[in-house]
Amino acid sequence: MRDIIVLGAGIGGLVTAVTLSRAGYPVTVLEAHVYAGGCAGTLYHKGFRFDAGATLSAGFYPGGPMDLVAQAAGIETWHGRPTDLAMVVHMPDGEMIPRWADERRQHAYQDAFTEQSMPFWHWQEKTVDALWDLALRLPTWPPQTARQAVEVISTGLNWTSADLFHRISPGLLADVFRLVASQLHRAPGRLRQFVDAQLLISAQTTSENANALYGATALDLPRRGVRVFESGIGSIAARLV
């Protein structure tokens, strides 16, 4: 059996390496930095810890991405503190708007942006729920064999039938080609500012340039099992090393 070399000890590289190792393959991970985790790493300087990039992590819910990672890596539990308050956004006028994971988020949106903003949030949540449902079915993409192609088609049909009228709707298909801004044209200006601030962090662009499906997903972090790691985001990589 040949050795497998994984380039980079970011989260993707570490998950790949530990999964292959548990499957019986000899694996070597090559990393240029002195710490693992990549942009989800924690570095040390003069006795202090600094997160390299992200300070929050999501996906820690039953059946979620990090739950699947834990199963693949043989990790019984992630040592992070769950939180319903993912972040507080400070607006230019001084108002602080919380982003809750639970039903409080709806009240926060109405208080900050009025009822006029709710169609946008309903679109965002409905859209991203459909996308996560598809992604967590783990379709093989792109398919490499005829068998895999059949499996992808079967997965797609099962996903479509789970919410037929929404998932074959012209709106969802059109969002493949539209921008987030197309869903904000009737929304309050402050809402666009609020959305753009978060997209700049999670999608590295604003609603005028972010694809609608990608942007809806990028805005969904508070609802996806957020955890805070007391010793830094690099704790995730440490569990995988």
Please provide the spans of the model-predicted regions.
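N-terminal glycine-rich phosphate/pyrophosphate-binding loop and immediately adjacent elements
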Residues: R2-P139
